[in-house]
Amino acid sequence: MSNKIQRVRGTRDLLPEDSILFRFVEESAYEKALLYGYGEIETPIFEFSDVFHRTLGETSDVVNKETYDFTDRGGESLTLRPEGTAGVARAFISEGMMQNLPLKFYYSGPMFRYERPQKGRYRQFYQLGAECLGYESPLADVETISLAWDLLKKIGISDDCTLEINTLGDAESRAAYRDTLVNYFTAHKDQLSEDSKMRLEKNPLRILDSKDEGDKKLNANAPKLEQSLNQTSQDFFKKVIAGIEKLGIPYKINDHLVRGLDYYCHTVFEFTTTKLGAQGTVLAGGRYDGLIETMGGPKTPGVGWAAGIDRLADLTPKELATKKEVIIAVVGADEQGEDESVKVAHEMRVRGFKTENFLSGKMGKKMQKANKLGAHYALILGGNEVTNKTVTVKNFTTGEQKEITRAELQTYPFSI
């Protein structure tokens, strides 16, 4: 290992220029969530390991290969959260919120997975999500998808995204499909990867998620879930599709889109893009009516989605995130001016203007820095201005320069 101090592999430093896009995505999501009646929730970045083992499944790649697990000094087995839904579900149970249904939660924050780092994928990544608990109606699925679509429109990437949607049916339909899959894959067991042979015993639907090329060939000819759907499941999905069409959200049905865990049911969906190479999914979600019960709580219907902020920010046009605001530079021409500049800069910030105060250096250099910063105005202070209680205002756009009183400065009409 090099002696040079460096980032841990799979992490990133979010520098100021990147933070502009990142913050824009977060603020846009928060704004849209509030419009849909969601309240913000913050859960710890680590939980008891069992929280994720129960929700993600002992056979999942996340639990087996990707979680950051550790034992604390008290001997407790803890895990850095690999996703946000489990923490929200745990909070719902442990905080006794069952009597307050229906509930809608919005969250954002860092998640952790030991994955192979690549474009758009990090070992510490940032995610935002929405969880709607207490509604059995397919209209809740429609509204959840609508929230996601509105966010993608707000950040300017909806034209590059495709909604892919499918149904998993209810528990009865899934059980029938499971039996059909077991029969199909058992007949081709010798062609399955080792991982999928294990999945065949514990959770055959996970084979459909396999990245192994041999498994993919088998999956192409596997029975389709729609062949196992009962009438109740078909009707539920028809209402979801009708709702999406009523809202004018473009979509395509992807019958290969599944979730391997038993608590998922009915609607599953993803928004995908071709702009990020192999990592095409930017937002994914679905209905999980069995999740709370799996964790030891009461049977509670739920539907939600999550999105990687890193990926959304990579797609967002920079001009959308750049605020059109007046930028003021305060320039002290000499020592007296520099001493007074702190007060003038404070007054401008109180008025709500973005203000940069150059605290040292020659005046010429300060003016160059102000120009490079993109300042629209410079407020120049020298000994004469301090004595006369004035300030010289320079408009970088027009080149106009004039001296005004400090009293006039308090209401001066700065504009772009």
From Swiss-Prot:
Organism of this sequence: Bdellovibrio bacteriovorus (strain ATCC 15356 / DSM 50701 / NCIMB 9529 / HD100)
UniProt keywords, alphabetically: Aminoacyl-tRNA synthetase, ATP-binding, Cytoplasm, Ligase, Nucleotide-binding, Protein biosynthesis
Name of the protein in its database record: Histidine--tRNA ligase
GO terms classed as biological process: histidyl-tRNA aminoacylation
SUPFAM superfamilies tied to this protein: Class II aaRS ABD-related, Class II aaRS and biotin synthetases
GO terms assigned for molecular function: ATP binding; histidine-tRNA ligase activity
A UniProt-annotated Pfam family: tRNA-synt_His
Subcellular location: Cytoplasm
EC class name: ligase
Stated family: Belongs to the class-II aminoacyl-tRNA synthetase family.
Subunit structure: Homodimer.
GO cellular component, one term: cytoplasm
Keyword ATP-binding set for record: yes
Annotated EC: 6.1.1.21
Catalytic activity reported: tRNA(His) + L-histidine + ATP = L-histidyl-tRNA(His) + AMP + diphosphate + H(+)
Gene3D superfamilies hit by this protein: Anticodon-binding domain, Bira Bifunctional Protein, Domain 2
